[in-house]
Amino acid sequence: MNTFSQVWVFSDTPSRLPELMNGAQALANQINAFVLNDADGAQAIQLGANHVWKLNGKPDDRMIEDYASVMADTIRQHGADGLVLLPNTRRGKLLAAKLGYRLKAAVSNDASTVSVQDGKATVKHMVYGGLAIGEERIATPYAVLTISSGTFDAAQPDASRTGETHTVEWQAPAVAITRTATQARQSNSVDLDKARLVVSVGRGIGSKENIALAEQLCKAIGAELACSRPVAENEKWMEHERYVGISNLMLKPELYLAVGISGQIQHMVGANASQTIFAINKDKNAPIFQYADYGIVGDAVKILPALTAALAR
């Protein structure tokens, strides 16, 4: 048997749902989708869900992962085995851990390849900081996976599809985190997974103020702006959601223009699937040039304005 009898899908990020649903279609005979609202439910059915389970009643001060208990109960009630697919977001990984405990299931994060052999999931993902690919065969009846972006192509909606809708009511967990305040992000979020052109900056850009030079290039060519992990996590120059690498975004754009990025393996795992890589770095021995199709050795602060002016013509 090369498919599961059932697969369960949930995404806290609506833009990741089409990809997860396409993976579900390849891996199971029946697709169940947990959703947070009616609009997401309608989308899930159009993307191939046979059954939609609307999570209902969570107080505003509780976290999405507190639905884990009722989700696990629902999964167990509808089969003695199954596959759970979640995005490899922060919330997706938190939920995966909770579901794994409640279902007594093996959990595998950041899956880049998923297949089924004899009713069991075989998963491949990066190990040793991206230096190798590990393969795991999950032996537990239930398997919980978080899926790296780009693992599956996005499913296409079909408005003629039909499915059944159910409601799963909130049950307060014995131990929960209560949200006391929320703060809006300072910048607009972007869906870098879908970007055709990406300009990505590293610490070689020199300063937070110099990122404006990369932003001007983005405007000139219609690209989205990304960064390396040190820019987001160490320097705090950009948001966490924009950094590319093994522990976050895995991109496949037509063009990846790396500015002041050294090219360590942990970063390149997230960018190496790009159709074309263009690098700008003042260190001619930077590892990035081993991956780049084109490169310029020089100071990015001087090169970016000239490149922007030339491409804006």
UniProtKB/Swiss-Prot annotation:
GO molecular function: electron transfer activity; flavin adenine dinucleotide binding
Highest taxon, organism lineage: Bacteria
InterPro entries the record matches: DHS-like_NAD/FAD-binding_dom (IPR029035), ETF_a/b_N (IPR014730), ETF_a/FixB (IPR001308), ETF_asu_C (IPR014731), ETF_asu_C_CS (IPR018206), FixB (IPR023461), Rossmann-like_a/b/a_fold (IPR014729)
Signal sequence annotation: none
Stretches that traverse the bilayer: none
Pathway: Amine and polyamine metabolism; carnitine metabolism
Keyword Aminoacyl-tRNA synthetase among UniProt keywords: no
Family: Belongs to the ETF alpha-subunit/FixB family.
Designated name of the protein: Protein FixB
Organism, scientific name: Escherichia coli O157:H7
